[in-house]
């Protein structure tokens, strides 16, 4: 069925022209196009309309699981009658296999799988094989090895009433599909047998199970029923059962793989012995032969993914099968927050290779294990077709490639994909940077999608709310602390919130102590703050439990704080990662959801990044003001309910998935996952006190503890002397 967009809203502001232009560009066959959408302009709604217009299977990529969950929730609301799937890493905890030569330490693979995420992943692959109205929201997990779609499709079981098949034949087929027989614990991925009745709980379905009734060697009846109550919901004429795992291999390929694994093992042992590395040879022989025995007897082994090249019959060095292979060739790829996602795609391969090369060199794995890897960036680009990049700050890679006639892709000139370099679009009166293309400001009727070399970067800078980009003001460094204090007091009187960004953790902590001694309700936020505290601090800021948040890197994409009206950027002229063009634009965007939004840059000189921020802001404000005047629009602040304090709702002994509770601030499952990883790492490092503290915080999270119940990690320093006249900068100097 076609995509059916369900929404009470109509495109407003720049959305209509962006939808029309990008739909036209994709329909014309252009491979690369970019949506340059400012914060709060409704980029997700625009993407949903484009998907509806194009009507093709779509992959939406995000650079982290939290934003992926937010997108999943939004697209589920936009397309309730279509298949919207969620594909991210299903590990609650994952310790990869590794070896540290200098200490002769081998770290065995350890992991904990989230069953709900596993079900959603299986649902993704089954939807892609059976229908076209599919939208998959995925993290970078989609470029990791997943197995062959041909093998997966070959292993599924098609059943229908009247089919000639014995009960034993069906049971054998289910076992080959990695289902487990369990007549008592009937859960996902299990089947049970009662006389001539076989009941199967598919791995990709949560609420339904299926009953197959036999009459001799013929299927007499198929019905869908509730696995909890046993109530039959409906009778079926046919049924498709998908494999219980995504890594499934037909029997003939499994036998062939055992032969080729043995051949590679013999070659590698001979090489080690020729080099005098007898320990490595013996280690590899013992480990691999044990795995071969497990594969022969059980059909799988621990770490079977390391033999994926043999199981799929790929030649050495060939790319692995991934989720991308489950899509038809004409699918659309949407890369959200492309300035962060594109570099992430390019960086996954190198990190994986460096770890596995050590395992191969020291005899823990065969060289073929190197081919169980994420895609290289060129392989990703080869497998994808048409791409829509979405970002408020698209990088040089996206801008350069988004031109008519570019059927391949232009790598970054320094072979570093996605590095921020230049003005993202042409500005009237500003010098043009040669490496960029101008964004489209023409009407959809005159938008050229056919002439080679024409830019395909579409602006979306008019917000549906009529809000303007925040004003940019520059103040001197000398009085930045006193000025910030006074500005905070003014905003606090109006019951508005303030973000202050510094360059170091120490400065953030000291500044918050100084403000606290002067009566300001303030907290700091940086990477040393535990996961629960970070989430609770953001929630408490929105709820008004404090007024000022001091941090290092507050530009996190997707950080939605409508109550923030002022962003103070200290030491703005210190050019670098934290004060780059992308960072400054993203940080300034945190004040773009408030009608009184303002950004203060404290600097003695105007850097190139600052100048570009000012030019971009002036250009956008001019267009926004003109649009509001022409259409008689009065700007209004964004309104959104503050989420409750972190908690987990337990129903019938089952942890409720956080995907349904995602509202944009945080993902409960993500928080727990990060905490559990920290706890496991602390325990493995024998830091048992730290592990116990993390365990207690997890318990507080489950009990619904608020921000005030979390113990501080640092004793605040008193700056009462400063309140009596001592300058903040001098006080810092005395502390060394």
Stretches with model-predicted labels:
Residues 1-36:
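Conserved pre-motif I regulatory segment
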Residues 150, 154, 504-526:
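Conserved helicase motor "Helicase C" RecA-like lobe of SF1/SF2 P-loop NTPases
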Residues 407-451:
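Intrinsic disorder/low-complexity segments
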Residues 28-50:
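Walker A/P-loop
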Residues 57-69, 86, 491-513:
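Conserved strand-helix element at the start of the C-terminal RecA-like helicase core
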Residues 87-136, 140-413, 448-477, 481, ...:
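N-terminal cationic and glycine-rich segments that engage phosphates or anionic surfaces
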Residues 27-34, 56-57, 133, 496-497:
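Pre-Walker A (Motif I) flank of P-loop NTPase domains
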Residues 87-98, 109-120, 141, 502-507, ...:
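Conserved helicase motor
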């Amino acid at each position: 069925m076609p995509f059916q967009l369900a929404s009470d809203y109509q495109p407003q502001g720049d959305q209509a022209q962006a939808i029309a232009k990008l739909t036209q560009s994709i329909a014309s066959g252009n491979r690369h196009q970019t949506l340059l959408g400012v914060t709060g302009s409704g980029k997700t709604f625009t993407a949903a309309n484009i998907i509806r217009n194009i009507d093709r299977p779509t992959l939406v990529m995000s650079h982290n699981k939290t934003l992926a969950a937010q997108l999943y929730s939004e697209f589920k609301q936009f397309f309730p009658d279509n298949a919207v799937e969620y594909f991210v890493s299903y590990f609650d905890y994952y310790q990869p296999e590794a070896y540290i030569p200098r200490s002769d330490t081998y770290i065995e693979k350890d992991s904990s799988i989230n069953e709900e995420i596993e079900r959603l992943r299986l649902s993704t692959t089954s939807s892609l094989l059976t229908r076209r109205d599919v939208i998959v929201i995925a993290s970078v997990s989609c470029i990791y090895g997943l197995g062959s779609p041909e093998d997966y499709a070959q292993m599924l079981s098609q059943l229908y009433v009247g089919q000639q098949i014995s009960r034993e034949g069906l049971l054998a087929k289910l076992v080959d599909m990695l289902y487990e027989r369990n007549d008592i614990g009937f859960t996902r991925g299990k089947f049970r047998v009662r006389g001539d009745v076989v009941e199967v709980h598919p791995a990709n379905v949560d609420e339904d199970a299926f009953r197959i009734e036999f009459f001799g060697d013929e299927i007499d009846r198929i019905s869908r029923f509730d696995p909890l109550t046993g109530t039959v919901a409906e009778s079926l004429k046919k049924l498709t059962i998908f494999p219980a795992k995504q890594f499934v291999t037909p029997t003939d390929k499994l036998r062939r793989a055992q032969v080729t694994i043995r051949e590679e093992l013999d070659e590698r042992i001979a090489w080690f012995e020729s080099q005098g590395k007898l320990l490595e040879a013996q280690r590899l022989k013992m480990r691999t032969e044990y795995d071969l025995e497990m594969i022969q007897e059980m059909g799988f082994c621990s770490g079977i993914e390391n033999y994926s090249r043999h199981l799929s019959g790929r030649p050495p060095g060939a790319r692995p099968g991934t989720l991308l292979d489950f899509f038809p060739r004409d699918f659309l790829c949407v890369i959200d927050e492309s300035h962060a996602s594109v570099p992430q795609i390019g960086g996954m391969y190198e990190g994986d290779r460096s770890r596995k090369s050590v395992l191969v060199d020291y005899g823990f794995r065969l060289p073929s294990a190197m081919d169980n890897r994420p895609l290289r960036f060129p392989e990703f680009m080869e497998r994808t077709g048409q791409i829509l990049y979405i970002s408020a700050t698209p990088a040089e890679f996206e801008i350069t490639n988004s031109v008519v006639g570019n059927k391949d892709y232009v790598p970054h000139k320094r072979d570093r994909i996605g590095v921020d370099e230049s003005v993202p679009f042409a500005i009237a009166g500003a010098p043009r940077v040669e490496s960029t293309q101008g964004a489209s400001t023409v009407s959809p009727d005159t938008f050229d999608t056919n002439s080679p070399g024409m830019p395909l970067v579409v602006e979306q800078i008019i917000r549906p709310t009529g809000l303007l980009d925040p004003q940019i003001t520059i103040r001197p460094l000398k009085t930045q602390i006193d000025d910030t204090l006074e500005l905070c007091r003014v905003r606090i009187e109006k019951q508005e919130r303030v973000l202050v960004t510094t360059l170091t953790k120490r400065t953030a902590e000291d500044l918050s102590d100084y403000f606290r001694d002067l009566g300001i309700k303030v907290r700091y936020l940086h990477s040393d703050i535990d996961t629960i505290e970070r989430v609770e601090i953001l929630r408490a800021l929105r709820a008004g439990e404090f007024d000022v948040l001091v941090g290092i890197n507050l530009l996190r994409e997707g950080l939605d704080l409508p109550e923030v009206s002022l962003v103070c950027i200290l030491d703005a002229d210190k050019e670098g990662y934290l004060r780059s063009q992308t960072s400054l634009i993203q940080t300034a965007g945190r004040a773009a959801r408030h009608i009184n939004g303002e950004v203060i840059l404290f600097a003695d000189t105007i850097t190139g990044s600052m100048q570009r921020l000012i030019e971009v802001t002036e250009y956008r404000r001019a267009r926004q003001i003109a649009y509001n005047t022409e259409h008689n629009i009065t700007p209004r602040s964004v309104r959104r309910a503050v989420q409750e304090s972190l908690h987990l709702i337990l129903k019938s002994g089952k942890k409720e998935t956080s995907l349904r509770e995602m509202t944009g601030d945080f993902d409960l499952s993500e928080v727990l996952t990060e905490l559990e990883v920290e706890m496991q790492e602390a325990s493995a490092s024998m830091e048992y006190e730290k592990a116990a503290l993390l365990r207690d915080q997890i318990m507080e999270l489950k009990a619904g503890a608020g921000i005030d119940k979390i113990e501080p990690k640092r004793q605040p320093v008193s700056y009462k002397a400063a309140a009596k006249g001592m300058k903040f900068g001098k006080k810092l100097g005395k502390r060394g």
